[in-house]
């Protein structure tokens, strides 16, 4: 999410931006825990109500924020927002399915590698250059992924890790699609993403013959994932991101990856495997290294990104 382009504010305030982005990461980190608390609903039902709640929230927010200019915002966002939304729907779907088939820590650590997939897609489709530092960090992250997925595959598992990779690629596709039109507001892309995810979920529900009826508590949990875990987290991030540098956003957003497994560990006792710890350490180390050393350029130091 930290690649969202927007207008830089005239008077950025780090004292405001830091707590907002940290809080956004905490909201995002709650997804794994909430999913584990769901009792009977299938992954497709969770995806349906999670994405539906987010879509309804965005409809309301777009009308409040843009009023009569809402149509113009969608027109200006154009095809990149639609393609980005499709990628985001793939990411939403992959994330929920990953939580169903693997540990929360595994899913989140693999999602943390999304910036490296973004770099590869940016090079392939936009001709963006990849620095030697980024290549080196990508190799370290790839080693981390191999440690995590290799251990699971050796045990005859690994489906959840593949879904997490799908989610990471989806988020990367969103970032690259938005780069094709600098300054694009991310709201239309998330609008389309949540709508497409509802459609994906509807197909999954139809094929699995699970229906739309869930228990009230599962409905509450699923909807809260859309309203609070994604929705409120995104709104906090977009406000806070206007006041921070790209490197700060990258590092502060890691609260999601760190807090997510800890929450599940403390509340329900889901302990990550040794392979997940080792692989996650390599991935997080690569991200921190790239963020800190990559911030040595004047542009990275001086320009807040949102």
Give residue ranges: language-model regions.
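Transmembrane alpha-helices of multi-pass small-molecule transport proteins
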Residues: 2, 40-90, 117-118, 170-174, ...
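Glycine-/small-residue-enriched transmembrane alpha-helix faces in small-molecule transporters
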Residues: 2-48, 86, 94, 143, ...
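Juxtamembrane helix-entry segments on the extracytoplasmic side of multipass membrane proteins
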Residues: 13-17, 40-48, 72-78, 145, ...
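Cytoplasmic-side transmembrane-helix entry/capping segments in multi-pass membrane proteins
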Residues: 18-21, 75-83, 129-141, 160-164, ...
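Hydrophobic alpha-helical transmembrane segments of multi-pass membrane transport proteins
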Residues: 23-30, 34, 61, 82-97, ...
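C-terminal-most transmembrane helix of multi-pass membrane proteins
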Residues: 51, 150, 218, 254-306
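Hydrophobic transmembrane alpha-helices of multi-pass small-molecule transport proteins
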Residues: 58, 62, 88, 130-150, ...
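C-terminal transmembrane-helix exit sites in multi-pass transporters
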Residues: 60-62, 97, 114-136, 146, ...
């Amino acid at each position: 999410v930290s690649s969202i382009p927007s207008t830089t504010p005239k008077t950025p305030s780090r004292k405001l931006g830091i707590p907002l982005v940290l809080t956004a990461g905490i909201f995002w980190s709650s997804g794994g825990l909430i999913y584990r608390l769901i009792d009977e609903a299938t992954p497709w039902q969770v995806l349906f109500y999670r994405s539906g709640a987010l879509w309804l929230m965005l409809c309301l927010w777009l009308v409040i924020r843009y009023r009569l200019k809402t149509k113009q915002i969608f027109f200006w966002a154009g095809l990149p927002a639609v393609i980005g939304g499709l990628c985001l729907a793939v990411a939403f779907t992959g994330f929920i399915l990953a939580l169903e088939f693997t540990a929360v820590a595994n899913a989140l650590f693999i999602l943390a590698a999304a910036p490296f997939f973004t770099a590869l897609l940016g090079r392939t489709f936009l001709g963006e250059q990849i620095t030697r530092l980024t290549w080196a960090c990508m190799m370290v992250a790839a080693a981390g992924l191999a440690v995590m997925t290799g251990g699971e595959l050796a045990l005859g598992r690994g489906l959840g890790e593949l879904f997490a990779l799908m989610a990471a690629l989806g988020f990367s596709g969103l970032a690259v699609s938005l780069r094709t039109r600098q300054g694009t507001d991310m709201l239309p892309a998330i609008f389309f993403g949540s709508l497409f995810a509802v459609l994906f979920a509807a197909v999954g529900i139809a094929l699995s013959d699970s229906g739309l009826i869930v228990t009230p508590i599962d409905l509450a949990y699923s909807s809260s994932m859309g309203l609070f875990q994604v929705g409120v987290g995104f709104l906090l991030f977009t406000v806070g991101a206007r006041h921070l540098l790209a490197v700060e956003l990258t590092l502060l957003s890691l609260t999601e990856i760190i807090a997510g497994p800890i929450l599940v560990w403390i509340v329900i006792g889901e302990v990550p495997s040794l392979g997940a710890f080792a692989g996650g350490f390599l991935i997080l180390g690569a991200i921190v290294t790239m963020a800190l050393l990559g911030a040595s350029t004047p542009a990275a130091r001086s320009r807040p990104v949102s």
